[in-house]
From Swiss-Prot:
Gene Ontology CC terms, in alphabetical order: cytosol
Protein family: Belongs to the HAM1 NTPase family.
Known cofactor(s): Mg(2+)
One annotated GO biological process: purine nucleoside triphosphate catabolic process
Species the sequence originates in: Clostridium acetobutylicum (strain ATCC 824 / DSM 792 / JCM 1419 / IAM 19013 / LMG 5710 / NBRC 13948 / NRRL B-527 / VKM B-1787 / 2291 / W)
Residues given in the record as Mg(2+) binding sites: 41, 71
Subunit and interaction comment: Homodimer.
Record-linked Pfam families: Ham1p_like
Binding site for substrate: 8-13, 72, 154-157, 177, 182-183
CDD domains: HAM1 (cd00515)
UniProt protein name: dITP/XTP pyrophosphatase
Length: 201
């Protein structure tokens, strides 16, 4: 069975990717399961550049496997696209959700709800071999609330309000989120591209 390494140790992300790709007959594993300890510098100027760099650095170590990597983040119109590619380290420390959310709320203080438009963006790269890769992007639009609402999810989820559900991402069930999230949209596009290679069904 062909192996796909997910270039992440984020358990939430790994679970979401495995769930959406379960129709394919692949052994999908995390970096930890492969005993890979690597910290790739995300110095690209776009989400897709960072995703490709992460995937390729790991592919160079395990050329017998395929590698899937994503880079995702939040873009806020009022902040000219920030936090963007710096979403995970917006407040200075990588992955400090609480501090990142506090900084975002403070920058948007006084901005009316209708001007708090935001997008969650996810770029995914699957490196198949040295010459072939698939690149896809998913996006969902919403608004930034003025306080954290909900306890599910991670990252900016408690601040990202989805008009379609009248809830934040952190109030959605896993199934609801997987049906509309930026990562779900990108993964569905990835599935479509993979099926063209006769990997599915």
């Amino acid at each position: 069975m062909k192996k796909i390494i997910i270039a992440s140790n984020n358990q939430n992300k790994i679970r979401e990717i495995k769930q959406i790709l379960k129709e394919f007959d692949f052994n999908i594993v995390s970096l930890k399961e492969e005993n890979i300890d690597i910290d790739v510098e995300e110095d690209g100027k776009t989400f897709i550049e960072n995703a490709y760099k992460k995937a390729y650095e790991i592919y160079k170590m395990r050329k017998d496997c395929m590698v899937i990597a994503d880079d995702s983040g939040l873009t806020v119109d009022e902040l000219e696209g920030a936090p963007g590619i710096y979403s995970a380290r917006f407040a200075g420390i990588h992955g400090d959700d609480k501090k990142n959310n506090e900084k975002l709320l403070s920058l948007l203080e006084g901005v009316p709800f209708e001007k708090r438009n935001a997008q969650f963006v996810c770029s995914i790269v699957l490196i198949i071999d040295e010459a072939n890769s698939i690149k896809v992007e998913g996006e969902i639009s919403g608004f930034i609330t003025d306080k954290e609402i909900g306890t599910k999810g991670f990252g900016y989820d408690p601040l990202f309000y989805v008009p379609e559900f009248k809830k934040t991402f952190a109030e959605l069930t896993e199934d609801e989120k997987n049906s509309i999230s930026h990562r779900a949209i990108a993964l569905e596009k990835l599935c479509s591209e993979m099926k063209k290679l006769n990997w599915g069904e």
